[in-house]
């Protein structure tokens, strides 16, 4: 008898009718002889509505109280789901994060799971219940409710699968799996049957929205096989598994892009020891994450420092750096929010050289200027003007033949 953890997002449980449809689907899986744990998000739009209410009361909401408020969204979903299962004649029980024993640290609105008590869930499973758990939430050692941040229900599902040694964790969403690129940008995008944890980690960190990066990281750590599939079809989706279980690694598995980036340059900075710390420490203290960094040295002991931040942090970063520039006697601070980071990802890059240069050739052929470059063992990212997003994605997708099952080892850019 297999133990299956299934997670359904807000779109999948966005109405009473959808909750009933999900309950029917879960019951069918249960009748195949499986023990079922179902993790649910809040109904579509509910989390944003609750956060909006918090901001209507406090301009900057108290984070502990915000967690108390926002966590109620999942409580509604799991209670309605359990009722739907019972109405169909089957046993079910709904549990909140603290009832399950999902323990977290004390970082409200972005807590991390520290441990899970499996005893209570196992007891309900042994009694033949379909157990439904509120995603996205947990409890501190002091009894305070916490939430895990956006995408937290994915993390809840994988954490439960790891803690209870489930046979599989199925993440249901409104798409059929992980695609070679965004189907909304290019209709030649192909669903990937299997992808490694490392590739999925890179794609998630670079803008792919199918899986939360913390969920992928946890799945890799505990070797949890994750099946990403559609709520609305019965077709097989994408399996995220250990690289060793994939028969043949593709050269490039996917292309993703992020329009959440902004580029900042501090011009003519004194090129001397400790200057980088003076620039980036105030940024770090403000909780602003810096991504790509390049340095361009001038004659006369001066340098330009260029880096990217999230577009949502751009205004704060520019304000902070305006003061920093005065302190370090830099010439000026400039910025650009109309950029996009385009990335190619594939474990096949480990064993094949020249992938980055091929990407650069393709950009050149299309007349696209590359502003910044970042690489890792299985990823190459470039920053380009946002207006070239679709052109770049399509050109790369065609050049690496991602619409085919078997990718060529040599790429034609002529």
Where are each of the predicted segments found?
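Non-catalytic alpha-helical coupling and interface elements of nucleotide-dependent molecular machines
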Residues: 55, 59, 90, 223-227, ...
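Short hydrophobic alpha-helical runs that function as membrane-insertion/retention elements
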Residues: 168-172, 226-228, 291, 372
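A conserved regulatory-domain signal marking ACT and ACT-like small-molecule sensing domains
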Residues: 239-414
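Nucleotide/pyrophosphate-binding catalytic subdomain
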Residues: 1-216, 308, 384-385, 404, ...
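Acidic-aromatic/histidine active-site loop/patch
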Residues: 219
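Glycine-rich beta-alpha junction loops
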Residues: 43, 175-177, 222-226, 230-235, ...
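Conserved dinucleotide-binding and phosphotransfer motif residues
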Residues: 32, 88, 222, 286, ...
């Amino acid at each position: 008898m297999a133990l299956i953890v299934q997670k359904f997002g807000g779109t999948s449980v966005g109405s009473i009718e959808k909750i009933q449809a999900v309950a029917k689907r879960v019951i069918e899986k249960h009748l195949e002889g499986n023990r079922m744990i179902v993790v649910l998000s809040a109904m579509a739009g509910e989390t944003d509505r609750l956060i909006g209410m918090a901001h209507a009361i406090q301009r900057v909401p108290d984070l502990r109280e915000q967690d108390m408020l926002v966590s109620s969204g999942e409580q509604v979903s799991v209670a309605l789901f359990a009722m739907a299962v019972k109405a169909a004649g089957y046993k079910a029980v709904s549990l909140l994060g603290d009832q399950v024993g999902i323990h977290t640290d004390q970082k409200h609105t972005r807590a991390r799971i520290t441990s899970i008590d499996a005893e209570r869930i196992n007891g309900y499973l042994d009694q033949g219940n379909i157990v439904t758990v509120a995603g996205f939430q947990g409890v501190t050692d002091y009894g305070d409710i916490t939430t895990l941040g956006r995408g937290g229900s994915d993390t809840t599902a994988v954490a439960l699968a790891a803690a209870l040694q489930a046979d599989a964790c199925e993440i249901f969403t409104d798409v059929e799996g992980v695609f070679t690129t965004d189907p909304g940008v290019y209709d030649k995008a192909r669903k990937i049957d299997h992808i490694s944890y490392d590739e999925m980690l890179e794609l998630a960190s670079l803008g792919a929205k199918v899986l939360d990066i913390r969920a992928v990281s946890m799945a890799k750590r505990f070797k949890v096989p994750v099946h990403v599939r559609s709520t609305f079809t019965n077709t097989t989706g994408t399996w995220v598994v250990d690289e060793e279980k994939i028969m043949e690694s593709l050269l490039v598995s996917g292309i993703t892009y992020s329009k959440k980036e902004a580029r900042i340059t501090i011009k003519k900075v004194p090129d001397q020891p400790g200057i980088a710390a003076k620039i980036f420490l105030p940024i770090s203290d403000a909780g602003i994450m810096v991504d790509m960094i390049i340095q361009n040295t001038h004659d006369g002991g001066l340098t330009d420092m260029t880096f990217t931040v999230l577009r949502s942090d751009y205004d704060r970063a520019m304000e902070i750096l305006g003061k920093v520039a005065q302190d370090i006697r830099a010439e000026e601070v400039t910025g650009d929010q109309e950029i996009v980071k385009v990335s190619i990802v594939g474990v096949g890059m480990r064993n094949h050289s020249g992938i980055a240069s091929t990407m650069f050739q393709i950009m050149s052929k299309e007349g696209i200027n590359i502003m910044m470059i970042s690489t890792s063992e299985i990823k190459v990212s470039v920053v380009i003007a946002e207006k070239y997003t679709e052109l770049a994605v399509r050109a790369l997708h065609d050049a690496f033949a991602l619409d085919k099952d078997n990718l060529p080892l040599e790429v034609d850019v002529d």
